[in-house]
């Protein structure tokens, strides 16, 4: 059996509205393109290449849609603050548009709200990769933008060294904003070193697509830390989920398609080098259901009464026959099987899997994974 320690070691444009003001002067609104001024308020559509300059601070008001053919560039050290009002403030990258948001470990990009209670709308990326939703396409939950297609290598840009704080705007009782929502995002998109911090919904959610993500942190997301559906078949490598409240939902919630468990292409991502820490309560840690498949390797899941749950015949059968696999994985209590097809006995029959009630703390995780000590990450 692998010990927990061994497991963890591996582990604005022409139509953009810009508002700026000087002391003792009324605010003025002008249309801009190119590099936006320090202190500007960003709102509306971006239809040509637009840059937020290094170290500048900006306000975000309402939905900002980056339109096809345009690129929104965000330089290191930029801080974007969502205005506290009743309007959903969010950034949405439409099909054919790109975002180039590259912070650094010492100078990350920070997107936040005026107060922790003011939940804002996060980032939404709509690509041209597959979704197994009916008709092969869909509309984003916030912003109503089209996503889906057949280009699994589609490139929506680059996101690196970004911290998103206090997302989770409630559009209605059914729809709240994630830190980042990936809608049909292709593998040509680069995503690494991203933190969702104290969001009011999921940290990161994948709706189909083939995007691969690395070095991702979901800290105290009040719903699911990581969530996928609609046929996502990319990968997530070096990830941390940490929950402070026992009321938080799943550390990973995974579906193929909630309306059609047999929809194709089937969700089958690779999750490798993952530390998933709950904080008590009766919730589930990893919840595999609705026909999803998965490759889980080198994972620790603890801090939940049910750290690993498998549901639905399609999901459990895939695990039983090897279409889905769980290896090098330690959970803090027995696996829970709803259909009794893939059982706790099957889990421990794999010699690299283990059940260890000890679990792991956030401090231990930091001690075993040097990247979690980088200054761009907040873990308190």
Locate each region found by the language model.
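Short active-site-proximal "capping" loops at secondary-structure junctions
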Residues: 79-80
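Jelly-roll (double-stranded beta-helix
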Residues: 2-3, 217
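Bacterial Sec-dependent N-terminal signal peptides
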Residues: 1, 10-40
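Glycine-rich loop(s) and the adjacent beta-strand/alpha-helix scaffold that form part
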Residues: 107-108
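Extracellular beta-rich repeat passengers
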Residues: 26-72, 83-96, 103, 112-201, ...
């Amino acid at each position: 059996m692998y010990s927990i320690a061994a497991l963890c070691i591996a582990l604005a444009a022409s139509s953009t509205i810009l508002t700026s003001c000087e002391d003792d002067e009324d605010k003025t609104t002008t249309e801009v393109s190119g590099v936006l001024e320090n202190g500007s308020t960003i709102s509306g559509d971006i239809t040509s290449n637009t840059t937020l300059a290094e170290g500048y601070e900006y306000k975000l008001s309402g939905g900002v849609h980056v339109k096809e053919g345009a690129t929104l560039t965000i330089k290191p050290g930029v801080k974007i603050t969502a205005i506290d009002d009743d309007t959903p403030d969010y950034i949405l990258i439409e099909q054919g548009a790109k975002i180039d948001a590259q912070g650094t470990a010492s100078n990350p990009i920070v997107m936040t709200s005026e107060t922790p209670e003011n939940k804002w709308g996060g980032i939404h990326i709509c690509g041209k990769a597959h979704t197994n939703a009916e008709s092969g396409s869909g509309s984003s939950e916030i912003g109503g933008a089209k996503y889906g297609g057949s280009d699994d290598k589609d490139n929506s840009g680059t996101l690196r060294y970004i911290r998103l704080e206090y997302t989770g705007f409630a559009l209605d009782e059914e729809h709240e904003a994630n830190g980042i929502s990936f809608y049909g995002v292709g593998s040509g998109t680069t995503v690494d070193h991203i933190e969702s911090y104290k969001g009011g919904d999921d940290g990161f959610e994948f709706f189909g697509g083939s995007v691969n993500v690395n070095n991702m942190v979901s800290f105290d997301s009040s719903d699911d830390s990581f969530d996928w559906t609609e046929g996502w078949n990319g990968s997530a490598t070096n990830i941390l989920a940490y929950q402070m409240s026992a009321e938080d939902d799943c550390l990973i919630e995974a579906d193929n398609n909630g309306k059609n468990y047999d929809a194709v292409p089937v969700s089958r991502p690779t999750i490798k080098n993952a530390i998933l820490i709950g904080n008590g309560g009766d919730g589930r840690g990893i919840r595999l259901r609705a026909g999803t498949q998965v490759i889980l390797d080198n994972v620790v899941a603890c801090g939940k009464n049910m750290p690993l749950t498998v549901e639905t015949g399609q999901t459990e059968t895939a695990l039983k026959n090897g279409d889905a696999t769980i290896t090098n994985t330690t959970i803090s209590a027995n696996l829970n099987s709803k259909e009794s097809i893939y059982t706790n006995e099957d889990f421990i029959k794999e010699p690299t899997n283990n059940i260890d009630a000890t679990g792991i703390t956030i401090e231990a995780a930091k001690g075993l994974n040097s990247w979690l000590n980088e200054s761009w990450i907040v873990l308190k």
